[in-house]
Regions:
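Positively charged, helix-rich recognition surfaces that bind polyanionic ligands
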Residues: 1-2, 12-23, 28-166
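Extended, low-complexity cationic-aromatic segments
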Residues: 6
């Protein structure tokens, strides 16, 4: 449904740089509001820089990825870094009375921590894939049975934290 003009704290026209805004979707995740813009503009002409040859990628739990040329990408362990904070927030949530305002606030706090962890993972993977695509012409990655690895209770947490499924 249409709601008309939406006031934003950021300068939206400066953000889209002269492109025509086709659609704006407003959503709420983890207690925060987000606006997603769909814009229409001419395709930019980009000169392709010469790329290196082929590379193979070996995914792992200890190091996120090891490239065939010897480059090692460390695993940031996003969940492990926020686990203590998450544990404390879950504990506080469990102590709140069901249906209360404070329980809702505690739920939002847990959701915000989870959203921050997911955002860190997504950001790292976006930066890594952009760098790989810009650096190498051919990329080969091993085919993993992630569902099977997650079934192993010893590996599950580490595999999910490294976000192999993405």
């Amino acid at each position: 449904p249409r709601i008309g003009r939406v006031h934003c704290m950021e300068n939206v026209t400066g953000r889209v740089r002269g492109a025509k805004v086709v659609r704006m979707t407003v959503s709420r995740r983890a207690g925060r509001w987000y606006a997603s813009l769909t814009v229409e503009r001419d395709a930019p002409t980009v000169k392709q820089a010469p790329k290196a040859g082929a590379v193979g990628i070996d995914l792992g739990v200890k190091t996120l990825a090891t490239l065939s040329d010897g480059t090692v990408i460390e695993n940031p362990r996003c969940l492990a870094a926020s686990e203590r904070r998450l544990k404390r927030a879950h504990k506080a949530l469990s102590r709140k009375t069901r249906g209360s305002k404070r329980r809702l606030k505690a739920r939002n706090k847990v959701a915000r921590i989870h959203a921050r962890i997911a955002s860190r993972r997504r950001d790292l993977l976006d930066k890594l894939t952009t760098w790989l695509a810009g650096t190498y012409s051919d990329i080969s990655i091993e085919d993993l049975n992630v569902a099977g690895m997650v079934r192993n209770h010893r590996l599950a947490k580490a595999v999910n934290d490294a976000s192999f499924a993405e």
